[in-house]
């Protein structure tokens, strides 16, 4: 996947819009992968699901903590992708106390499938989800890919290590 372009996909997000008023001042916003990644160098990490143990205990807090250091190494933004809808992703980011990393809800799994990372996790009652990966994207081109070992449908485990913020930081420091 390295040196290939990210797939064309649309992310469906809810954004606060004070002009709406009322108890739910949010509107739909649609961003394409091109709008998100063009003319930028970003870190993206993807995980099986919001509110899941490894994702909530290690991966999201780790990237949030490492945000400033990652940015200092020539990265414009840090994104988390999950095959969850915008409502779930927003609530999860609030629950996690995230202030810096940005959520990209891939509710239809289109981006994840285009990355070749969509797996079946029906053995856990999850349905189709993302395999855990991280990547550095430069101007829509995948510069570096980190993928957990053992990618397969209905994987009995949840490997984590190769896609940690520490691994991404190590790479960024080596190429800086």
Feature map (PLM): residue ranges:
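Chalcogenol-based redox active-site neighborhoods
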Residues: 1-176
């Amino acid at each position: 996947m390295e040196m290939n372009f990210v797939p064309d996909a649309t992310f469906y997000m809810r954004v606060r819009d004070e002009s709406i008023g009322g108890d739910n001042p949010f509107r739909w916003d649609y961003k394409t992968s091109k709008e998100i990644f063009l003319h930028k160098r970003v870190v993206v990490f993807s995980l099986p699901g919001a509110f899941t143990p490894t994702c909530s205990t290690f991966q999201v807090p780790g990237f949030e903590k490492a945000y400033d250091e990652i940015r200092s190494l020539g990265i414009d933004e840090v994104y988390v992708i999950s095959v969850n809808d915008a409502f779930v992703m927003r609530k999860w980011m609030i629950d996690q106390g995230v202030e810096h990393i940005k959520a990209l809800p891939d509710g239809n799994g289109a981006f994840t499938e285009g990355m070749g990372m969509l797996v079946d996790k029906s053995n856990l009652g999850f349905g189709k989800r993302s395999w855990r990966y991280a990547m550095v994207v430069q101007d829509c081109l995948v510069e570096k890919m980190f993928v957990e070992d053992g990618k397969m449908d209905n994987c009995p485990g949840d490997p984590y290590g190769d896609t940690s913020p520490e691994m991404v930081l190590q790479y960024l420091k080596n190429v800086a």
